[in-house]
Amino acid sequence: MQVIGRGGANILIDYGDPTWLWRCCIRWPDLLSSNNSYTIKNISYIKDYVEPLLHGLLCPMYLIDVDIEAIRPILSDFILNLDDKVVKVIKIKNLTNNTSNLILNNHFLKSYCSQNLQTVILELKPKWLYYDTDYCRNCTHNAFKGRGTKYCYNQLLMNPAHLELIFGECNIFPVKFKDAMHEYLRNDNNIFKILYDLQKKLTKNTTPISDIKSINDVNDEHLLLMTLRDVTCFIEWNSAENALHVNIIDVDLKPKEKWTHWTKTYSQLTSSQKIYHTSNK
């Protein structure tokens, strides 16, 4: 058993099953019970509010109980007081178990392939596909953070030919895979268009970040919008089918307390150097 991934609020554990992984919340480092309570609330939120919006593209996941003794050696490195007898774990499908080679790895894109290139997987973070500012929120934020990204998922949505910028100088991808991606992006049911439409609808029905002055200004629709701005998408292609399979992860409920971070970031970007696109909406 080992940790194979860590974010700000979760760890991903390989427990020996090549098909499934355990996802454990570590958002609250003092008490296991606090993380357990959130996980129960989170999985209900995902199933009740997020999954119905995603056209069957949510990665398979469900809640299980794991005895604390089975996982204590790992969790004790992340949580001070393991004050429950069980750990509420989200069991989630392992989306990269058919691949072994990491081809590309940057802040918003990872790409994996099998040894014989019969399977290719893209792991993408499209972030703010819809934005209501005159500047590109993703590209402006990247510039503010000092990330020299040459591509933009909003631009990919507007023009599938932008895919070549995303792949860059990496020429290992099979032609059939590239063709399948281009065809997928021309379809209005592609995941980027789905997320764009959802983000646009929610943006128009929620309080702008610039107008949020306290936690009381953050409603459920705003939390859902921020969730959909932070998802990760897996797109898998295999040569046998010559077809794409899409899964979405990282659809967690955001704590309302994050409003201070959101408004601070908005203020920083407002006064920073902007990145504009001639075609952005």
Swiss-Prot record:
Keywords, in A-Z order: ATP-binding, Kinase, Nucleotide-binding, Nucleus, Transferase
GO cellular component: nucleus
A GO term, aspect molecular function: ATP binding
Residue positions of motif EXKPK motif: 123-127
GO BP terms: inositol phosphate biosynthetic process; nuclear-transcribed mRNA catabolic process, non-stop decay
Substitution effect: residue 10 to D: More than 95% loss of activity
Record-listed E.C. numbers: 2.7.1.158
Domain comment (free text): The EXKPK motif is conserved in inositol-pentakisphosphate 2-kinases of both family 1 and 2.
UniProt name for this protein: Inositol-pentakisphosphate 2-kinase
Source species: Saccharomyces cerevisiae (strain ATCC 204508 / S288c) (Baker's yeast)
